[in-house]
Amino acid sequence: MEVVILNENGDSVGNLEIVDEIFKSEVNNNLLYEAIKNELANRRQGTHSTKTRAEVSGGGKKPWRQKGTGRARAGSTRSPIWVGGGKTHTPKPRDYSYRLPKKMKRKALLSVLSLKYGSNVLKVFEDFTFDAPKTKRMASFISKVKEPNTRKVAFVVGKDESLGDNYNKLLLSLRNIKDLKLVNADSMSIHPLFYADEVYFTKTALSKLNARIKG
């Protein structure tokens, strides 16, 4: 299939031939759910920790004798039912990350791209050239080409030697724009693509993805 390449003004400047499955695969919602859940789990720090009755300070001595006081019996001030006592079934540091099979990740990526392309919210732009990084220029470009109701934008970029230093200048120009998420074509995440109102590709980024999918 061919996709239209746009310039900074949103005008067509050519086409790019890519394999059909990138934008015309069957959308698998269950697979998208599993892929997004996996990405979010892998982001978790897992540093949560609460002290048990064995770890809180104090409470080594029995507060009062067993009988004869009229009060409920107590063996330690570290008991979970006491104020300042330890907690039961406490969260402890753990690793939440797990691996998703490569074929599942690949199909999930094709699903989210096909979903966005089928919804007419995916655009491909020619590569940008810069004399110097300019956030103002890219912010103006985004506001010009996006739809009126669009808030979140995912921008997929790809690095190539032919671009010279323009790749780094593009990153510097885009990274501080509100509600814009940068996505690297070499390691594309499903989460920012799925939750974006619009998805933009540079020509180089789509070419790299096409080469990867073709194998």
From Swiss-Prot:
GO terms for biological process: translation. GO terms for cellular component: ribonucleoprotein complex; ribosome. It comes from the Bacteria. Residues 43-97 are annotated as: Disordered. GO terms for molecular function: rRNA binding; structural constituent of ribosome. InterPro entries: Ribosomal_uL4, Ribosomal_uL4-like, Ribosomal_uL4_dom_sf. Keywords: Ribonucleoprotein, Ribosomal protein, RNA-binding, rRNA-binding. The keyword Nucleus does not apply. Part of the 50S ribosomal subunit. NCBIfam families: rplD_bact. Belongs to the universal ribosomal protein uL4 family. This is Large ribosomal subunit protein uL4. It comes from Brachyspira hyodysenteriae (strain ATCC 49526 / WA1).
